[in-house]
Each structure stands twice: as C-alpha cells, then as structure tokens.
C-alpha cells in the first residue's frame, strides 16, 4: 500500500453537494481496512518528532482521522463541533463560507493554556474550517503545533488562509 494507492481510491463525485463542485469522496478509503489503517499510519508518521498534547478535529470528517490518530499516538482528542452539539460551556468562532457564515464551537475546558495541539482534518480546501478550529484552540491559550490533512485541493489555495501555520498534507490534487 502506498499514498498513491490511497489517492486512486478517493473518488470524485461531480456536482456534489451542489452543481460545479467536484467532491472528493474518502469513503472507499474508510471501508477498506488496509487503506484506512495505512492512512492513519502515514498521518502518524508525518507527526514523528513533534511534541504535542492533543489532537483537535472539526466535525464531521475530521473526526474520522483525528480520533483514531489520537488513539494511535496516545494523546487526547478534542472535538470541534457545529453549534449546539457540545454539552458543557463552549466558546464559538464564526467564519465566512462562499455562501454565508458558519460557526464552530469548542468546550471552554478542552485545552489548557500552553498545551500544544495538532489540528487534523480529512481535506484542505479553502481552509476556513481549520482556521476557525485553530482560532478556537488559540483563544483557550493553546498553541497550534501544526495542521495535518490527508488530502489537499491545491487549486483552492487554502494554504493562504492558513499562512503562519505549519501545514502538512499527504495527498495533493
């Protein structure tokens, strides 16, 4: 198994979720035990030598890679969720989408001041979701060590939105 094999497994769905979008569907990777395990191993390898305390990931697809990666590396996992999904007191960050505004929330006690956090998501597109996640971590006093993606859509220039952060992506489209 190689990252090229994983890339070939990611299928493109035209006009999803709306016309003109070419959606990168990772579900074939998730359903294949060897491919999914290899993806987690390669994400773990990308973080070798780094010192951090937590992995944070935005819902929903960030959870698919962030939680197993945290388990694999023996660190805690912090979910970053849509409004109203977390039960305790939260902090919120509003961000712009192509078609309006959205927001994400994190528990106020999810990160202790000075903790180093890696943010994990499945895909870097425009960067808005992980930017909001990073701002939430920082607002709690955490330090964003790096932002890690399985895939990146380079033509959308999401790295520009994340300027100043250490960005790692394993597969580029």
UniProtKB/Swiss-Prot annotation:
The entry lists its GO molecular-function terms as: adenine binding; adenine phosphoribosyltransferase activity; AMP binding
Q: Which Pfam families match?
A: Pribosyltran (PF00156)
The record's annotation in InterPro entries points to:
Ade_phspho_trans, PRibTrfase_dom, PRTase-like, UPRTase/APRTase
Known Gene3D superfamilies for this protein? Answer: 3.40.50.2020
Entry GO CC: cytoplasm
The pathway noted for it is: Purine metabolism; AMP biosynthesis via salvage pathway; AMP from adenine: step 1/1
Q: Does the keyword Glycosyltransferase apply?
A: yes
Principal place where this protein is found? cytoplasm
Provide the protein's localization.
Answer: Cytoplasm
Listed CDD domains: PRTases_typeI
Q: Which cysteines are joined by disulfide bonds?
A: none
Catalysis performed (reactions): AMP + diphosphate = 5-phospho-alpha-D-ribose 1-diphosphate + adenine
Question: Which keywords fit this entry according to its UniProt record?
Answer: Cytoplasm, Glycosyltransferase, Purine salvage, Transferase
The record's top EC class is transferase
- Identify the EC number(s): 2.4.2.7
GO BP, one annotated term: purine ribonucleoside salvage
Known function = Catalyzes a salvage reaction resulting in the formation of AMP, that is energically less costly than de novo synthesis.
Family under the similarity heading: Belongs to the purine/pyrimidine phosphoribosyltransferase family.
Q: What is this protein called?
A: Adenine phosphoribosyltransferase
């Amino acid at each position: 198994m190689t990252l090229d094999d994983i890339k070939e497994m990611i299928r493109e769905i035209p006009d999803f979720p709306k016309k003109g979008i070419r959606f990168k569907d990772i579900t074939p990777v998730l359903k294949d035990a060897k491919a999914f395990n290899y993806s987690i191993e390669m994400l773990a390898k990308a973080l070798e030598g780094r010192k951090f305390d937590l992995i944070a990931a935005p819902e929903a697809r960030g959870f698919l890679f962030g939680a197993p990666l945290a388990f694999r590396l023996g660190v805690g996992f912090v979910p970053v969720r849509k409004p109203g999904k977390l039960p305790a007191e939260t902090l919120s960050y509003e961000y712009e989408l192509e078609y309006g505004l959205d927001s994400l929330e994190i528990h106020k006690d999810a990160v202790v001041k000075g903790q180093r956090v890696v943010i994990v998501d499945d895909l870097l597109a425009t960067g808005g979701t992980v930017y909001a996640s990073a701002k939430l971590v920082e607002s709690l006093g955490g330090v964003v060590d790096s932002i890690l993606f399985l895939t990146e859509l380079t033509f959308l220039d999401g790295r520009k939105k994340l300027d100043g952060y250490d960005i790692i992506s394993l597969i580029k489209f």
